[in-house]
């Protein structure tokens, strides 16, 4: 569960922290936000939507490259590309849509969370075009530690996150190539989904696997203007994977 959100230069928020803890310092199971129109209620929900979008940019890259390379597949390719770009965005588009207009500083999103009593935080910071800082703190084995801390000049990934040296090296190499235009989490999730034998997933520590399941199972729906709505349904692949047939035990 989420414990707090910090947002800087995000939509209408120049600098805000939204606390989701109760009086006993535990995450609230239900939070209702109410108030007048235009005060930023939807922008808080948009932070979760934006987080989910940043996890998919590597998959978007593959999708667009495949479409561009196939010159004969579709007659209305430009219309399809326009549609895909509106639904599946690269990091620069995500920043452009969410960073406060005319803001001079960086945009920052920080999420505090609690998974099975273990607390952590995930930070994502951008300039006007790309990611410039990304960091995850969570329980490594018994104590809380830094999983990764990446900036434009530093690439620090804790080897304890992976059970296999080759996997660590493979992910680090991918980050050297793609990070900035894609987040570490997007790169890692793409590598996991790209391997049919699930090798990389098996080489991830249990606590990191718990975090990945938590962060990829966010579901939210937000409104754009008075008519348009968009949403993300975060479900494990085992759920609703086969639409043609199936059964639900009662």
What positions do the PLM features span?
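Generic preference for well-ordered secondary structure
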Residues: 2, 28, 35, 95, ...
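Conserved P-loop NTP-binding catalytic core
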Residues: 47-121
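A generic structural signal for short, solvent-exposed coil/turn residues
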Residues: 10-12, 25, 101-103, 116, ...
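Electropositive, glycine-dotted interaction segments
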Residues: 108-249
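Pre-Walker A-like glycine/lysine-rich segment at the N-terminus of P-loop NTPase domains
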Residues: 1-73, 77
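Intrinsically disordered, low-complexity boundary segments flanking structured domains
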Residues: 1-8, 95-99, 170-174
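Short amphipathic alpha-helical segments, especially helix-boundary/capping motifs
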Residues: 25, 84-85, 229
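Residue-level signal for well-ordered alpha-helical segments
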Residues: 10, 21, 28, 88-90, ...
